[in-house]
Amino acid sequence: MKLTKLALCTLFGLGVSIANAADLPNITILATGGTIAGSGQSSVNSAYKAGQLSIDTLIEAVPEMKNIANIKGEQIVKIGSQDMNDEVWLKLAKAINAQCKSTDGFVITHGTDTMEETAYFLDLTVKCEKPVVLVGAMRPATEKSADGPLNLYNAVVVAADKKSSGRGVLVAMNNEVLGARDVTKTSTTAVQTFHSPNYGSLGYIHNSKVDYERSPESKHTINTPFNVEKLDSLPKVGIIYAYSNAPVEPLNALLNAGYQGIVSAGVGNGNVNAAHLDRLEKAAKDSVVVVRSSRVPTGYTTRDAEVDDSKYGFVASGTLNPQKARVLLQLALTQTKDPKVIQQYFEDF
């Protein structure tokens, strides 16, 4: 289905001069599907199917990108990001590592549902200092007010800017640049859904330029110990959600299924009820790594506060939310099962 003219009109008037292709940076776009490649039957209805449009179609819809970079597209998968999995994560990381020397930057088109998890996984596993920028959309390409075309254009602006190098993996959405470790989706429907609630944005995109205000302080990319080149799978780590009167059966199901790590999405400062605490203590004694996080959207999960992590052998997630704590724990388990070493990973990365 053709993209609506209104969706593309948002790019008019950007005023980017046409440059000689030989003088432009080379940017590789790795496409995975998502709403940015979504298609619906109506331009005024939010019903659509994700991942329908090819990377070639997305590139053709935003010809202005060719004024700022030489664009090459590669279709990795065509899925909604609710179906994102370890296999695709590994494929993306390996593709970026393999092509790092032959391109000046990468853009990854991705669904917004799990974008923050993919971004953080790549932040920990990509061994390349060149820009890696994830981008998506909250409205499908066929909707009248589609945000995807301008988001994609801006992502290329970010990837083509040398100032983006060395900042870790980035997310470019709605004129903002956000760091992979801190960014999270905050609204199910709003265009301005991505925020970094603990630390704020890294910078902003305006009139085809990036204005950076800060860089991430945590270690990333080339400064992590995680090498995925020989991996074809990741350790099994599950998340258990805490709430009033929460039963232990879901936790038992994961442990009985052989999960090597458990992340607790606790209440408040990562707290769980007495039954959960008892079961998690037993799991830790059986060499299952337990990480305490919180379902609360901002703040720290503090080590040795209400829960004596040192006594139980638990790991505290700091400012990582449960879904990102799971990502780091999966990678940590490829290196060690020592909770003291893993605690240091959570403080460093």
Swiss-Prot record:
Signal peptide residue numbers: 1-21
Kindly give the SUPFAM superfamilies that the UniProt entry links to this protein. Answer: Glutaminase/Asparaginase
Q: Tell me the keywords, alphabetical order.
A: Disulfide bond, Hydrolase, Periplasm, Signal
| Main location, first listed in the record | periplasm
Instruction: Supply one GO CC term from the record.
Output: periplasmic space
- What does the record list as GO biological process? asparagine catabolic process
User: In the UniProt entry, which residues are flagged as the active site?
Assistant: 35 (o-isoaspartyl threonine intermediate)
What molecular functions are annotated in GO for this chain?
A: asparaginase activity
Q: Where is substrate annotated to bind?
A: 81, 112-113
SMART domains membership: Asparaginase
Record field: catalytic activity: L-asparagine + H2O = L-aspartate + NH4(+)
Instruction: Extract the Pfam families matched here.
Output: Asparaginase, Asparaginase_C
Q: Indicate the segments forming the Asparaginase/glutaminase domain, all copies.
A: 25-349
Enzyme Commission identifier(s): 3.5.1.1
Locations listed in the record: Periplasm
Keyword Signal included in the entry's annotation: yes
Q: Disulfide bond as a keyword?
A: yes
Cysteine pairs forming cystine bridges in this chain are: 100-128
| Enzyme class of the recorded protein, top EC level | hydrolase
What the entry lists under PANTHER family is as follows: 60 KDA LYSOPHOSPHOLIPASE, L-ASPARAGINASE
What NCBIfam families does the database record attribute to this sequence?
asnASE_II, PRK11096.1
Q: Which family does it belong to?
A: Belongs to the asparaginase 1 family.
> Could you tell me what this protein is called?
Probable L-asparaginase periplasmic
Give the species this sequence originates from: Haemophilus influenzae (strain ATCC 51907 / DSM 11121 / KW20 / Rd)
Its taxonomic placement starts with: Bacteria, Pseudomonadati, Pseudomonadota, Gammaproteobacteria, Pasteurellales
